[in-house]
Amino acid sequence: MGEVYRLAEQKDAEQLLDITYRAYQLIRELGLHWPAANADLAMIEDNISINECYVLEVSGTIIATITLSKEEEVKKFSPLPFIKWFAVSPEYSNKGYGGKLLDWVEEHIILGQLGSPEVTLATAKKHPWLVEMYERRGYERFLELDPQNGDGIMYLLKKTLINKPHFIQRG
C-alpha cells in the first residue's frame, strides 16, 4: 500500500467532509462545540482555502487529515503553530495512520518548512482519551481555559520537536 502525504485540494472536500464527520462522532456525542464536528461542505472548502490542510492517502484513498491553522484561534495564548481538525477515517483508526500523518506534519511542515521547534493543539478535558493520547505522543499541557460555551475545561498542549529522545532498537 503506497502512502502519500500532501496538501488537500478543493476536489478532496467531499471526501474530507465524510471522514471528518464520521471521525468526530464522539465529539458530537460529548456535546463539544468544535467546528470540525459539525462542519458542512462550505466549511471544509474554506478550511482547505484558508489553512494548510494535509491528508494521508493510502492506495489512492484519503484516510486521515490534519490542518495547520493560518487563523488566529490561539495567537493570544501562543505564537506557536497550531494544528487542528485532526481526523482519521474510522475504518483506519487504531492502525497507526493518524500518528504517521501527525509525525509527518510535525517533522516536515512545522519543523522542516516553518522552522518552529514547537507546535500546539487544543483538546477537551472531558474527552475520554484524547488528552492521554497526545501526552503519550510528547505533548504537554501548558494552558487550561474554559471557553464558557458548555465545553468545559479545554487544554492547550505543546510539543517540542527538537531534541526528542531517539530510541535504539537492539537486535
Segments predicted by a language model, with ranges:
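Residue-level marker of the N-terminal boundary of ABC ATPase nucleotide-binding domains
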Residues: 2, 80, 131-133
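Conserved Rossmann-like nucleotide-binding pocket used by diverse enzymes
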Residues: 4, 82-84, 120
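A short beta-loop-alpha structural element at the N-terminal edge
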Residues: 4-18
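Acetyl-CoA-dependent GNAT
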Residues: 10, 21-91, 102-104, 108, ...
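Short alpha-helical
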Residues: 11, 15, 62, 128-129
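Non-catalytic, surface-exposed connector residues within folded enzymatic/regulatory domains
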Residues: 77, 95-96, 151
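Conserved glycine-rich acetyl-CoA-binding loop
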Residues: 89-103, 124-132, 136
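C-terminal "cap" of GNAT-fold acetyltransferases
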Residues: 115-137, 143-171
